[in-house]
């Protein structure tokens, strides 16, 4: 999972 995906989820 990339950092962009992580930020979208949070």
From Swiss-Prot:
- GO biological process annotation, one example: 7-methylguanosine mRNA capping
A GO term from the CC aspect: virion component
Query: What is the role of this chain?
Result: Displays RNA-directed RNA polymerase, mRNA guanylyl transferase, mRNA (guanine-N(7)-)-methyltransferase and poly(A) synthetase activities. The viral mRNA guanylyl transferase displays a different biochemical reaction than the cellular enzyme. The template is composed of the viral RNA tightly encapsidated by the nucleoprotein (N). Functions either as transcriptase or as replicase. The transcriptase synthesizes subsequently the subgenomic RNAs, assuring their capping and polyadenylation by a stuttering mechanism.
Reaction catalyzed: RNA(n) + a ribonucleoside 5'-triphosphate = RNA(n+1) + diphosphate; a 5'-end (5'-triphosphoguanosine)-adenylyl-adenylyl-cytidylyl-adenosine in mRNA + 2 S-adenosyl-L-methionine = a 5'-end (N(7)-methyl 5'-triphosphoguanosine)-(2'-O-methyladenylyl)-adenylyl-cytidylyl-adenosine in mRNA + 2 S-adenosyl-L-homocysteine + H(+); a 5'-end (5'-triphosphoguanosine)-adenylyl-adenylyl-cytidylyl-adenosine in mRNA + S-adenosyl-L-methionine = a 5'-end (5'-triphosphoguanosine)-(2'-O-methyladenylyl)-adenylyl-cytidylyl-adenosine in mRNA + S-adenosyl-L-homocysteine + H(+); GTP + H2O = GDP + phosphate + H(+)
Q: What is its EC number?
A: 2.7.7.48, 3.6.1.-, 2.7.7.88, 2.1.1.375
Q: Where is it localised?
A: Virion; Host cytoplasm
Q: Which domain of life is it from?
A: Viruses
Q: How does it assemble?
A: Interacts with the P protein.
Please give the name of this protein.
RNA-directed RNA polymerase L
Q: What family does the database annotate?
A: Belongs to the paramyxovirus L protein family.
Alphabetical keyword list: ATP-binding, Host cytoplasm, Hydrolase, Methyltransferase, mRNA capping, mRNA processing, Multifunctional enzyme, Nucleotide-binding, Nucleotidyltransferase, RNA-directed RNA polymerase, S-adenosyl-L-methionine, Transferase, Viral RNA replication, Virion
User: What residue ranges are annotated as transmembrane?
Assistant: none
- GO molecular-function terms, A-Z: ATP binding; GTPase activity; methyltransferase activity; RNA-directed RNA polymerase activity
Q: Where does the UniProt entry say this protein principally localizes?
A: virion
């Amino acid at each position: 999972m990339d950092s962009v995906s992580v930020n979208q989820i949070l």
